[in-house]
């Protein structure tokens, strides 16, 4: 029996996207970070959070706690819409998604080297080109029991999202090919 048949028969077992995290590693503070914030806000529709350097690196001119990156967490419909555009951009730059990008609980990540590959984006010399990392986290119905305050419990292993389930979900929902090595 395929996963699709199981999901139709038992909807609680169907995985869903918990969140999509978009990371911009700008590498420096200042104008480039400000422009990057405008780019990421235009792509996602949400204002980003600045990420701080964890350690000092004099070779790159980075001090501890200096803002060097941006991130946005998307959930629900916004996450799915952004992921559709991200897969379009990912395919446009000639990349393929490999099964090795998925971990054992179905989460995966990929990178888009240029933000201008997204639909509706044009190159602007004053902005430049920004790349990003996109991380997708999966869950199933009932995952709230592990994070709630009252009567917290663990999720049994049989109810965790597997690598194969996540791959089939992505292939069916977003019409994206995942190459198995």
From Swiss-Prot:
Matching Gene3D superfamilies, A to Z?
Answer: 3.30.1440.10
Q: Does the keyword Membrane apply?
A: no
* InterPro entries (UniProt xref): Ribosomal_uL5, Ribosomal_uL5_arc, Ribosomal_uL5_C, Ribosomal_uL5_CS, Ribosomal_uL5_dom_sf, Ribosomal_uL5_N
What would be an example GO MF term here?
A: rRNA binding
Q: What's an example GO BP annotation here?
A: translation
Q: What keywords would UniProt list here?
A: Ribonucleoprotein, Ribosomal protein, RNA-binding, rRNA-binding, tRNA-binding
The record's GO CC annotations read:
ribonucleoprotein complex; ribosome
Q: Which PANTHER family match?
A: 60S RIBOSOMAL PROTEIN L11-RELATED
Per the similarity annotation, which family is this? Answer: Belongs to the universal ribosomal protein uL5 family.
Family matches, as NCBIfam families: PRK04219.1
So what does this one do? This is one of the proteins that bind and probably mediate the attachment of the 5S RNA into the large ribosomal subunit, where it forms part of the central protuberance. In the 70S ribosome it contacts protein S13 of the 30S subunit (bridge B1b), connecting the 2 subunits; this bridge is implicated in subunit movement. May contact the P site tRNA; the 5S rRNA and some of its associated proteins might help stabilize positioning of ribosome-bound tRNAs.
Assembly with partners or alone? Part of the 50S ribosomal subunit; contacts the 5S rRNA and probably tRNA. Forms a bridge to the 30S subunit in the 70S ribosome.
The protein depicted here goes by the name Large ribosomal subunit protein uL5
This protein's species is Methanococcus maripaludis (strain DSM 14266 / JCM 13030 / NBRC 101832 / S2 / LL)
Which gene is transcribed and translated to give this protein?
A: rpl5
